[in-house]
Amino acid sequence: DGEIVIKKIEKSKIVNSTEYYEEAKKLYASSHSNLVKVNYGCSDADFIYIAMPYYSKGSLKKIVSEKNLTIREIIRFSIQFLSGLHHIHSKGLIHFDIKPDNILISDNNEAHLSDFGLTKGMNSFGFANPEQIYSKQVPPEVFSSTDKTIHYDIYLSGLTLYRLLNGENHFHNQLTRFKSQDDYINAIKTGHFPDRNSYLAHIPLKLQRIVNTALNINIEDRHKNVLEWINQLSEVEEN
């Protein structure tokens, strides 16, 4: 029992609504404690409706805008949402929309990954392609390759941790320095955005290195998978 919210999705904004249903069913059929539960779904001629629990605490983006989280809290929340992401990958899916807005905090103070609207199934080679991208969080391979792998999600999760550790102002101040879209794209491709050498003073160097591994511009130099990401985070001490 409890409050629920209804998410209303325009079918016209989904390239293939049948494919959307099939991938959603594959994900929702196997629940995970760190994924937002879907209570039920239905549709009419124009919309898809999805019912899910109401999260009164809101998203990690909301929480970090109101207070500073400790290193321990950020690592704990990160391991939790990454556990949900690992489950998604194990089902042959890529999320494609990892960001602080899409990590909700439950009443039990646990992180749940949400919003599977861009999630796509991988082909037999482990590739998939998103229908859209979030312009503030873009992996460099977007500009050089049509085939995306789970490393797309690993980069996005690294960028998410970078934002959680340094704060939204630190992140957005870097964004405002670009004079053109070409400057922004070039900074992503060359690894100059976000600034991997610019962390708040209290962030442990070991944690900085782990996050920067996820943010490597070369996918083969990122974490091989989410479990490797989680294992490294679990070894970080606060001081």
Language model regions located:
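A short, aromatic-enriched beta-strand patch in the conserved N-lobe beta-sheet
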Residues: 40-41
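Catalytic-loop of the protein kinase fold
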Residues: 89-105
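ATP-binding glycine-rich loop module of kinase domains
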Residues: 1-15
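AlphaC helix of the protein kinase catalytic domain
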Residues: 60-69
